[in-house]
């Protein structure tokens, strides 16, 4: 490639020189010195190692965060489980108490029905007594 570049330069120098501003001149491409390449490679590997270390550290931190979140979630679910167990126990107690009160509630319902029937009988008796009173007053006036 260097030989081709030299050939191009030689061809251009044989041409008559122009003062045209659009014409560009080429310079010979030089390979960097061996020490520069070695230093650049070391620098590249050092920066790549720093980059990869950062990426791995970030990934590791993400996994630690997920682990902590999972632990907290697990604790919350354990708390919720305990609460649900307590609620279930309390509901069973309430159901037992309700079952114990059920005969009394049934008696209350029966008494309520009897009171309603007695009230209807009282209204009928009141209406009948008013009719009797009206008849009595009518007979008394005669």
Curated annotation (Swiss-Prot):
Positions with biased composition (Basic and acidic residues): 12-33
Modified residues (N-acetylalanine): 2
Subcellular location: Cytoplasm, Cytoskeleton, Microtubule organizing center, Centrosome; Lysosome membrane
Record bears the keyword Phosphoprotein: no
Pfam families in the cross-refs: BLOC1_2
Main location: cytoplasm
Sequence segments annotated as region (Disordered): 1-33
One GO CC term, this protein: BORC complex
Keywords, ordered alphabetically: Acetylation, Coiled coil, Cytoplasm, Cytoskeleton, Lysosome, Membrane
Tissues expressing the protein: Isoform 1 and isoform 2 are widely expressed. Expressed in various malignant tumor tissues (at protein level).
UniProt keyword Coiled coil present: yes
GO BP term (any one): anterograde synaptic vesicle transport
Domain of life: Eukaryota
Coiled-coil ranges from the UniProt annotation: 79-127
GO molecular function, one term: gamma-tubulin binding
Function field: Component of the BLOC-1 complex, a complex that is required for normal biogenesis of lysosome-related organelles (LRO), such as platelet dense granules and melanosomes. In concert with the AP-3 complex, the BLOC-1 complex is required to target membrane protein cargos into vesicles assembled at cell bodies for delivery into neurites and nerve terminals. The BLOC-1 complex, in association with SNARE proteins, is also proposed to be involved in neurite extension. As part of the BORC complex may play a role in lysosomes movement and localization at the cell periphery.
Similarity comment text for this entry: Belongs to the BLOC1S2 family.
Subunit structure of this chain's protein: Component of the biogenesis of lysosome-related organelles complex 1 (BLOC-1) composed of BLOC1S1, BLOC1S2, BLOC1S3, BLOC1S4, BLOC1S5, BLOC1S6, DTNBP1/BLOC1S7 and SNAPIN/BLOC1S8. Octamer composed of one copy each BLOC1S1, BLOC1S2, BLOC1S3, BLOC1S4, BLOC1S5, BLOC1S6, DTNBP1/BLOC1S7 and SNAPIN/BLOC1S8. Interacts directly with BLOC1S1, BLOC1S3, BLOC1S4, BLOC1S5 and SNAPIN. The BLOC-1 complex associates with the AP-3 protein complex and membrane protein cargos. Component of the BLOC-one-related complex (BORC) which is composed of BLOC1S1, BLOC1S2, BORCS5, BORCS6, BORCS7, BORCS8, KXD1 and SNAPIN.
Protein name: Biogenesis of lysosome-related organelles complex 1 subunit 2
Lineage summary: Eukaryota, Metazoa, Chordata, Craniata, Vertebrata
